[in-house]
């Protein structure tokens, strides 16, 4: 293990090298802090990460740590390029449930749309794999200036009940609401305003979960907006 790259409630992430027949390769290693954290059980996070599978907007997982000399649990992940930064900081005592964005964080609508599309695709992928992320916040998202993004941190993740369709739908709509909060924050960081995206955001936050759109509807709306002529631009974080 080398230098610390970051840490959260459930563990510490280190830069490391993975040995193979082809040589040493830089990776990131997450070691969990203990048997129980504020996010839950490390073994639950590990299971959810592995069950999530591969997706362009999820941080790739290469495997789990075994035979650690101190018996610690951990995961081996891809080392993400330094151009990716955390979208926002966790909530403060003042904001309670809302993440804290740097005052300098501004997006074009194109970049905000690209982030929204990536996270919506990742969330839909997780749900089809039976995984509920449980912490769909900006502080768990890495992004770069073109709007490429990665969703990480499965500390609060859980598995959807396979034989209870009603409960699955309700849990998915809770995550849709979380996406609505994220979309609202992204739009607040845009100088330009867009009525279509604001309407989608408001539907995601509807007080009646049954009125909230499905992930398929969200994807279709974002794709339609993108096809209407919104092209990615380069912004500064």
Predicted stretch roles:
Residues 9-47:
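ATP-binding glycine-rich loop module of kinase domains
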Residues 207-213, 217-231:
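Terminal C-lobe "cap" of eukaryotic-type protein kinase domains
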Residues 150, 155-201:
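C-lobe/activation-segment region of protein kinase-like
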Residues 123, 127-144:
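Catalytic-loop of the protein kinase fold
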Residues 70-84:
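Conserved short submotifs of the Hanks-type protein kinase catalytic core
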Residues 48-56:
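Structural motif at the C-terminus of the N-lobe alphaC helix and the adjacent alphaC-beta4 loop
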């Amino acid at each position: 293990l080398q230098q610390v790259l970051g840490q959260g409630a459930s563990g510490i992430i280190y830069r490391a090298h993975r040995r193979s027949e082809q040589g040493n390769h830089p990776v990131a290693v997450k070691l969990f802090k203990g048997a129980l954290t504020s996010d839950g059980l490390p073994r639950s996070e590990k299971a959810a990460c592995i069950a999530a599978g591969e997706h362009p907007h999820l941080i790739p997982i290469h495997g789990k740590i075994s035979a650690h000399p101190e018996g610690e649990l951990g995961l081996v992940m891809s080392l993400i390029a330094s151009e990716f930064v955390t979208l926002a900081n966790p909530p403060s005592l003042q904001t309670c449930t809302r993440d804290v964005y740097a005052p300098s964080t501004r997006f074009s609508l194109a970049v905000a749309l690209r982030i929204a599309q990536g996270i919506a695709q990742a969330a839909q992928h997780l749900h089809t794999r039976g995984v509920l992320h449980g912490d769909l916040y900006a502080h768990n998202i890495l992004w770069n200036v073109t709007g490429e993004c990665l969703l990480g941190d499965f500390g609060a993740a859980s598995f959807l009940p396979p034989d209870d369709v009603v409960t699955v739908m309700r849990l998915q709509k809770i995550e849709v609401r979380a996406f609505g909060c994220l979309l609202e924050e992204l739009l607040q960081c845009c100088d330009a305003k867009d009525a279509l995206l604001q309407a989608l955001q408001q539907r995601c936050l509807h007080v009646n979960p049954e009125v909230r759109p499905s992930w398929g509807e969200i994807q279709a709306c974002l794709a339609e907006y993108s096809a209407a002529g919104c092209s990615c631009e380069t912004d500064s974080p």
